[in-house]
């Protein structure tokens, strides 16, 4: 089949192409465009008054492209629901410091956290002077996040941030996506993955195994590059 000769003459492209599949909504050559493309789908959804989630995936390498930041800025200003997955598999964009960020990440990436947050906020607003208490808590939380939580760059742009999350932990990812769907506005899920995870030859040499066609597991041969 064409899939078996992907990235070779006569085979399927390594990138989305509309003439190859009706599931490919647009033509592209690199994922620096993914957030912008997702925003287009988000805008179409909102104009049609439909309700579903749009998810764009972008790698840490693609995030170096200026188009990605233009789209992030636009995503913040639109103030509509949009999920962005940052696949961090090469470098740590925002390293954890000690165990506190890991603990806080686990807490704020759970449904129970958002249930408690909503209940406490609603209760405080009913009390005399409750609105001032809520604002004081928000300021304290913001200052604390600037000190110990990763992803502050995205938060400063007005985009909610969840993570870092182990991208190979499916159960954890499902929980985090459930939380992301409850957040109003754009949200980034920062997943940390290991390139070639689960296949030792690819783990040892991730660069050589990037974007290649199918290879034999028993007689491993890689295509040569002229």
Give, region by region, the residue ranges found by the protein language model.
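Predominant activation on well-ordered alpha-helical scaffold segments within soluble catalytic domains
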Residues: 35-42, 72-73, 83, 151, ...
């Amino acid at each position: 089949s064409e899939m078996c000769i992907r990235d070779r003459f006569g085979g399927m492209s390594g990138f989305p192409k509309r003439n190859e599949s009706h599931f490919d909504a647009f033509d592209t050559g690199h994922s620096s465009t993914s957030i912008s493309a997702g925003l287009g789908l988000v805008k179409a959804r909102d104009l049609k008054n439909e309700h579903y989630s749009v998810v764009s995936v972008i790698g840490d390498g693609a995030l170096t492209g200026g188009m990605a930041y233009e789209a992030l800025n636009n995503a913040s200003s639109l103030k509509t629901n949009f999920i962005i997955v940052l696949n961090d598999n090469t470098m740590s964009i925002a390293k954890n410091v000690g165990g506190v960020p890991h603990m806080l990440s686990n807490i704020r990436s759970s449904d129970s956290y958002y249930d408690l947050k909503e209940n406490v906020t609603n209760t405080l607003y009913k009390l005399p002077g409750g609105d001032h208490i809520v604002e004081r808590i928000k300021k304290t939380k913001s200052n604390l996040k600037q000190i110990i939580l990763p992803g502050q760059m995205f938060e400063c742009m007005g985009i909610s941030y969840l993570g870092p999350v182990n991208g190979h932990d499916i159960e954890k990812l499902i929980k985090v996506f459930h939380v992301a769907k409850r957040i109003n506005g754009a949200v980034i899920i920062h997943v940390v993955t290991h390139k070639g995870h689960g296949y030792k030859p690819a783990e040892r040499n991730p660069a050589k195994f990037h974007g290649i066609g199918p290879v034999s597991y028993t007689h491993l041969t890689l295509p040569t590059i002229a």
